[in-house]
UniProtKB/Swiss-Prot annotation:
SUPFAM superfamilies: DNase I-like. Although widely expressed in all tissues examined, except the spleen, high enzymatic activity occurs only in the brain. It comes from the Eukaryota. The chain crosses the membrane at residues 326-346, 354-374. One of its GO terms (biological process) is intracellular signal transduction. This is Sphingomyelin phosphodiesterase 2. It comes from Mus musculus. The lineage of its organism: Eukaryota, Metazoa, Chordata, Craniata, Vertebrata.
Length: 419
């Protein structure tokens, strides 16, 4: 690698709100999005909620000259909705589906059927290895009564672990997507603390766009006040996060968002605002010991957020086990009822009534059995994430007590930040 190596990486991210039969003006919005991406000529365009593979193929054909490489990440019954368009050849592709993703009986929310996931693409840019990730986490739906909070924390941890373990050979790491979390939310803090990723909005030298970088704003005609909840001025739930891993320094020169409409018309691309970032990457000479400046103060934030996350997962585990136990009792009660009905059916007097009641009783047992199995699986998934956090927390606490060997993510972050 040349000592004077540098490059600029222009990135586009958007939650497209492309739901067949439900989203408004899909065809027009996809057409305008394709025109805009061709005009701007980004290095990477990472999209979420493209839940129509036909629309992806439309964009792929429309963008083929500007973005010759593209990929659609498939998962679940409906699909992950994730896709990428790249001006540069994609060397490797991998997808990880989150193990916890809501509840199948909350069908009106639909997250469980989508197979929410994270997609990884590896690019080589003049010798530099870039790991780019695109993801979409579980929606919140209600700030006051968030029944999916534990699932979203578990997803954030799973995402952080995935990045942590797959980015060790990368020079630069980029994560874009709809995290469905506010900047100070537990899952967002957990993700940034464990991976060492920087928030482009916080770090940028030049920001232009909506107030406070909000990516859902009231002036967008597709956004209702119900979507914003207790935040009438807007919410920031879409992110561009980045870091340097090896002998590089990366910073966000510019960050722009749309402000309720696309830059070339008075209509929005989506109910979310688009993010457009320019990252500047340059070679940074290696330091003798990039970890010597790291101490207990830097580690304490990670320890604190891990403890809080484990507590929240514990509450989720207790809830999942309660539902599993309740459905278990229902199964026992239903089976007992079936035995009684079979006895009654053997007689002459109540045979017809018993046979009729057997049908809903069998249905009750089957439904309760499905609920039992699902919540047992949910409890195990939350326990797994909690156990992984405990392992990291124990190591970090011991290291803090010794006052040495800071965690790997922070060391890599510090090394990348040294210019």
């Amino acid at each position: 690698m040349k000592l004077n190596f540098s490059l600029r990486l222009r990135v586009f991210n958007l939650n497209c709100w492309d739901i067949p039969y439900l989203s408004k003006h899909r065809a027009d919005r996809m057409k305008r999005l394709g025109d805009f991406l061709n005009l701007e000529n980004f290095d990477l365009a990472l999209l979420e909620e493209v839940w129509s593979e036909q629309d992806f193929q439309y964009l792929r054909q429309r963008l083929s000259l500007t973005y010759p490489d593209a990929h659609y990440f498939r998962s679940g019954m409906i699909g992950s909705g994730l896709c990428v368009f790249s001006k540069h050849p994609i060397q490797e592709i991998f997808q990880h589906v989150y193990s916890l993703n809501g509840y199948p009986y909350m069908f009106h929310h639909g997250d469980w059927f989508c197979g929410k996931s994270v997609g990884l693409l590896v690019l080589r840019l003049s010798g530099l290895v870039l790991n780019a990730y695109v993801t979409h986490l579980h929606a919140e739906y209600s700030r006051q009564k968030d029944i999916y909070f534990a699932h979203r924390v578990a997803q954030a941890w799973e995402l952080a672990q995935f990045i942590h373990h797959t980015s060790k050979n990368a020079d630069v790491v980029l994560l874009c997507g709809d995290l469905n979390m506010h900047p100070k939310d537990l899952g967002c803090c957990l993700l940034k603390e464990w991976t060492g990723l920087h928030d482009a909005f916080v770090e940028t030298e030049d920001f232009k766009g909506s107030d406070d970088g909000c990516t859902m704003v009231p002036k967008n005609c597709y956004v209702s006040q119900q979507d914003l909840g207790p935040f009438p001025s807007g919410i920031r739930i879409d992110y561009v996060l980045y870091k340097a891993v090896s002998e590089f320094h990366v910073c966000c020169e510019t960050l722009k968002t749309t402000t309720g409409c696309d830059p070339h018309s008075d209509k929005p691309f989506s109910d979310h605002e688009a993010l457009m970032a320019t990252l500047y990457v340059k070679h940074s000479p290696p330091q003798e010991d990039p970890c010597t400046a790291c101490g207990p103060l830097e580690r304490s934030d990670l320890i604190s957020v891990l403890r809080e996350a484990r507590t929240e997962l514990g509450l989720g585990i207790a809830k999942a086990r309660w539902w599993a136990a309740f459905s278990g009792y229902v199964i026992v009660w239903g089976l007992s009822l079936l035995v009684l009905l079979c006895v009654l059916a053997a007689g002459e007097e109540a045979r017809e009534v018993a046979i009729i009641l057997c049908i809903p009783s069998v249905g009750l047992v089957l439904v309760a059995g499905a609920v039992y199995l699902f919540h047992k699986q949910e409890a195990k998934g939350l326990c797994r994430a909690q156990a992984e956090m405990l392992h990291v927390l124990t190591r970090e606490t011991e290291t803090q007590d010794r006052g040495s060997e800071p965690h790997l993510a922070y060391c890599l972050q510090q090394e990348g930040d040294r210019a």
